[in-house]
Amino acid sequence: MGDAAAAAPAAAAAGPSSTRGEPKDPRTIARKYQLDLCKRAVEENIIVYLGTGCGKTHIAVLLIYELGHLIRKPSREVCIFLAPTIPLVRQQAVVIASSTDFKVQCYYGNGKNSRDHQEWENDMREFEVLVMTPQILLQSLRHCFIKMNSIALLILDECHHAQPQKRHPYAQIMKEFYNSNSVEKFPRVFGMTASPIIGKGVMPSHSFTEKGGRSPCQPLIFFLPKGGSNKLNYTKCINSLEELLHAKVCSVDNEELESVVASPDMEVYFYGPVNHSNLTTICIKELDSLKLQSERMLRASLCDFKDSQKKLKSLWRLHENIIFCLQELGSFGALQAARTFLSFDGDKLDRREVDLNGSTSSFAHHYLNGATSILSRNKTDGSHAGSFDLEKLEEPFFSNKFSVLINVLSRYGLQENMKCIVFVKRITVARAISNILQNLKCLEFWKCEFLVGCHSGSKNMSRNKMDAIVQRFSSGEVNLLVATSVGEEGLDIQTCCLVVRFDLPETVASFIQSRGRARMTKSKYVVLLERENQSHEKLLNGYIAGESIMNEEIDSRTSNDMFDCLEENIYQVDNTGASISTACSVSLLHCYCDNLPRDMFFTPSPVFFYIDGIEGIICRLILPPNAAFRQADGQPCLSKDEAKRDACLKACVKLHKLGALTDFLLPGPGSRKNKVSVTNNSSNNKVEDDSLREELHEMLIPAVLKPSGLKLDSLSNLHFYYVKFIPIPEDRRYQMFGLFVINPLPVEAETLQVDLHLARGRIVKAGIKHLGKIAFEKEKMMLAHKFQEMCLKILLDRSEFTSPHVKLGNDVTLEINSTFYLLLPIKQKCYGDRFMIDWPAVERCLSSPIFKDPIDVSVHASYSSNESLRLLDGIFSKTDVVGSVVFSPHNNIFFFVDGILDEINAWSEHSGATYAEHFKERFRIELSHPEQPLLKAKQIFNLRNLLHNRLPETTESEGRELLEHFVELPPELCSLKVIGFSKDMGSSLSLLPSLMYRLENLLVAIELKDVMLSSFPEASQISASGILEALTTEKCLERISLERFEVLGDAFLKYVVGRHKFITYEGLDEGQLTRRRSDVVNNSHLYELSIRKKLQVYIRDQQFEPTQFFAPGRPCKVVCNTDVEVRLHQMDIHPDNRENCNLRCTRSHHWLHRKVIADVVESLIGAFLVEGGFKAAFAFLHWIGIDVDFNNPALYRVLDSSSINLSLMDYTDIAGLEELIGYKFKHKGLLLQAFVHPSFSQHSGGCYQRLEFLGDAVLEYVITSYLYSTYPDIKPGQITDLRSLAVGNDSLAYAAVEKSIHKHLIKDSNHLTSAISKFEMYVKLSNSEKDLLEEPACPKALGDIVESCIGAVLLDSGFNLNYVWKVMLMLLKPVLTFANMHTNPMRELRELCQCHGFELGLPKPMKADGEYHVKVEVNIKSKIIICTAANRNSKAARKFAAQETLSKLKNYGYKHRNKSLEEILIVARKRESELIGYNEDPIDVEADISVKMKSPHIHEENIPFQNTETSFTRSSKFHNQIIAGSGKHDVNNGRNNQPKLATQSGRLPSEATEKSNKKVYHGDMVHKTARSFLFELCAANYWKPPEFKLCKEEGPSHLRKFTYKVVVEIKGASATLLECHSDGKLQKKAAQEHAAQGALWCLKQLGHLPKEEDVRV
């Protein structure tokens, strides 16, 4: 869509105005006439008509300055400055920015980038002057990026292009938007031009005369002719320009300008007349013969018609350029042109190189080499261009015209400070002349360069180089430019003294502008004119006379006539205001097609057929097979161009109604090209960055554990739960404990079973059992609270016990955000299975001296020596010491005392010495009471996370018994801390924090289940443990994780959303459907849905940290509120110093990635699938806010519409294909569509791409289900890797070849056929043979048909996944064994480099000779491995290079440290596969009733739109009949049959001529010519239009007869080239009609016309 599709802002151009400096006032340097014109422009719309160099731009700057109050920010209005070329845009932006202090931004582009509404809105808010090409503004207005109401001042440079009878963007802006009734406020309009007219001007009767005896080198000074001029066109141009711009043309008296601007003297130099020499004629004949030879070779080598036509056109253009240079410049000029093409443009003219007789040259190079040889033979032997003198420059070496140019340059070249521009029409001529002039010694004083547009196709010309050349010309480094029209306007060239028109200007404006380049005083404007060429003389005369006439007409108009305005049909979208018209409909349609999915074998593009009807020309538009629909017919129009525009407008309207165009009339989401912002990163990167962003969220506290209504100072009834511990193996004793809570736990919580993982693989299975309620008196409650506080201090904060006194009962307040529960030791009653709290044990612990006030501690009781022990802090009874906690200050360690070793004391032997000696040597302690028995003690352990997925510390897979480790301690080195706190009690308490953490999480999951259950009953089908698994991330490092559920849920979500989009949006292509699905399933959207349902509070994303275990008796000390939240939880902390990032506060804050919050949605879907099936998952999706429902009629419409493909039934063996697939289709059209490649467009139906989208989605789910169920123990990442291997294009392509379904692919691309054949041959080789060959690129189409086939089965079965499951297992059986596993080599290479710390370099691919050359570099310490590969597909080339690099690294001995997938699958536990969760009721679909009809009717919808009418019912019926009567076609699967030549004689059989000029359409009598009928027949069958050629003219001039032949190219199984000749006729139309009659008769006999049809012509 041209410039509008890409408004690339050039901030550099407007850099000076980006900041406000000192005020700039452009009035200080303005001339009087500029100020006068500016004053008038402030008051009304005007068009300033001044010559080049008269300061028009400065008047515009003055106007911007005067109206600055309207655009100064914060005003929402702007000034828009339009310039028709990119150099002008850049130049004018710099001028405005340097002359004013406005914020300026300029826009231009080539369609590679695009800007959205938000970016335009931002720029309108930031900048005050926007300088752009008119196409950008036009498209921005059409798509409502910019509205006319927001423009305060509209400036149009070179505004003469705005003519109502033209479709220039200037004219369209004014016609469609300035004159629109919807515009409330119109901007001020200011136009600038050096010539207010367009075209060639008037043709005066005066002609140039050349005085006799004058040398060709002497100029003819021209004098203005008088009279005889036709002024009407000038008047119309000026009147029309004023009317369209709503402005008045204003100018300045010539006398005032003469003192300011110099006007060059004009001189005319004659050459010729042109009479080509014999040598030139011979060269032309030889070049023609060379062209024919190249054509024959090209046709013989290429079997693809489209490819050969493209190459032929390139060859013809090349030949025509060489011939033109030969005639205009001579043989040496043509030789230079050929050499230039050969060195620069070979690839441009013929991108895909094809070998010729073993040579590596392309057809273009073959022709150029031959042309160079021919032209070189005619050059004087041993001579060089630089050695020639002026006298020797004669024809045919140089043409006479070129010799005159050299004479002119020789004459003026010796003048001081001379600078010259030579204007030519063609780029080829510019380059050839420049090359020759640079090498002529006689012109060595000229330093020459050529200047052409950067869009000219020249590889060595860019905008930067253009600017550099102009800069060098201005500085004098270059003093001669050979330029095309790009030098006439848009480039600031001010110091030119001589302008030479080698070729005449084509318009008056071109004449004036090129002349205006000679701005210096005493400048010359030289025109080369051919002698005796009357048309050229009249043309030049008209240009010269036109300027005077324009001035007269501006002063006093002689007529009010104007050109008729070209009316446009417009379609407008009501809710956005976006609009399209017939002016832009063609470009918009091409833009839509350009955004359709494509591959290297197919380029989507519309095809146009024209039908010459009675009421006018009708255009039939055929869209690509992957478009939303296939055909649109326009209304009868007077010209092909208007008919084409009308058909395109109808197509665009229908595309919008089908959703393929958005409400802003742009290609819908999912277009092939990513819409990349020119100022920001891509939207994909933004979404990715957002998903990785961390946010602070609270974690939910289980409501059942909150202390609601509990008072510690009163009687309370608590629910009693017995905590069960089952050690495996039974190598430890555990004190029985009870859990006491205020509210009863949910029933599902009572089923809690947790494996607590100890060292060496040992496990304790823990659970709870409800035993009823128990009453707590006030004293008992306080006692229990103190006991729990004591236990937690010993486990987590035991450093407090190093002091002689510890106070309990400080933290007895109950916070609303905290939990309340009690963990107390229990014992079995003496009778029955009843349990009770072991209050004596509690009281005994709390009676320890450390908890008493020092002043309250009585003197130790006296014990007998046999019953007591002397400890560090006194004498204690042995019964108090055993089963207590002691502290040894000499090593700062706490111990459990498990017993007293009566037989061992300090004198006993220990490690070759006594214990006394050991303590003296090790700790320098002299024991005072060595006779005391030693204590058997066990060090108190640090509390650990027992939910951790700990790896066994030995190679044994099961836990083994582990003997406890005890030490012997002298009692006198220990101080007694807690009496009665035994080792068994400590062991139990070490398990309880992990158990309670899991219980809290389970209670949170139950709460979420209750929330969902209140909204949909299907939530009852999922267990709380399943929900908990779906809420727990891998970061928790537990034995449960959401990742497996997430993998399954992600695949299911893509399937059901893709299915919904497929059925709902029938008009969207594969790419748009993918984008629509992505909009729903992407992390950003899932995050929003999750936040809306507050799922983030349920997520568990941190591993249990025992040090941050808070419970009654150990409350959280970090009080968090809104005032300190940000300070407490800082995010911008270095990863190495993030102590506070996971700080636990009173509000349970934690940091969560957005992606994690999104992943939980998918994991919950997976959980519902596994436990509740599809129906439960659908209910959850509806609750979360994802719509996946659709109406059955929508499916029926899709099934019914598939019958359009039944016309292809003869292309393949349907029964055989169904047998290969293992499924019998009810709707055969679906099966046929699944095998139609988009390159095949010779039918009315579509291609497989939409079915491929659907099949890809369902295949991903069923493969995921297969892997999930078959391998229950493999990691989620490994499931993803295996799935990628299974559904990768290579694997699917292998499956297609193994099952031979690829032979049924319907295609029309010889390149694709060749690629498939190469791949098929490779697949069928043995492994040893494959090792010797490079694997060919896998054609994507092979994998696509497997996916589209799966999609077709899904639709035909009414979404019955059981059928899809069976077909998948059969088709992919060789793949699912994973026998020949091929991982992605690029991924494997990246992982290998990361594993070993190698630096991986991937330079950008370089394209040359039609192939991508890819390099892979790996830096191994001081050595670099470099591997390269080349392929037409860049991904394939990178794959090959990566494979070679991997091979080299493995040869060096570098391997991945982790197990490969092959090794994992060998040992993985395997179960029988199953289709997970499928309990959906399939839709009842009836058999296709039209299956017996080989030729279904095609119904074209009528398209209503503004200012147009819909008809063509007649054409649609005709199309139906043509399809119905078509003979058998065959795509040949790429086999190119040479066309048969069938020639029909000029005379027709009598039965053919007896038929009359009428054709019956279902009872309607419609008159139609045979020629028109033939055009319609070709269009209906998607053939090329018939070609009529004049064969012979005979007879005298007044009785001349014409004989025509018509050529019809019939595509199909028997490709036929039909030629029919007419009899001699007095009129050409009659001869064409007679030939068409013969063609129709032959087509009827061949079966391409219904036998029952009566065709009389």
Swiss-Prot record:
ATP binds at L50, G51, T52, G53, C54, G55, K56, T57. Disulfide bonds: none annotated. The keyword Cytoplasm does not apply. Residues 1533-1547 have a biased composition (Polar residues). GO terms for biological process: DNA-templated transcription termination; lsiRNA processing; maintenance of shoot apical meristem identity; polarity specification of adaxial/abaxial axis; reproductive structure development; RNAi-mediated antiviral immunity against RNA virus; siRNA processing; ta-siRNA processing. The record marks K1340 as: Important for activity. One of its GO terms (cellular component) is nucleus. Residues 1384-1451, 1569-1645 form the DRBM domain. Disruption phenotype: Formation of an incomplete shoot apical meristem (SAM), abnormal vegetative development with alteration of adaxial/abaxial polarity in both coleoptiles and the first leaves. Abnormal spikelet morphology with disruption of organ identity and lemma polarity. Gene3D superfamilies: 3.30.160.20, Dicer dimerisation domain, P-loop containing nucleotide triphosphate hydrolases, paz domain, Ribonuclease III domain. May interact with ARGONAUTE1 or PINHEAD through their common PAZ domains. This is Endoribonuclease Dicer homolog 4. The lineage of its organism: Eukaryota, Viridiplantae, Streptophyta, Embryophyta, Tracheophyta. The gene is DCL4.
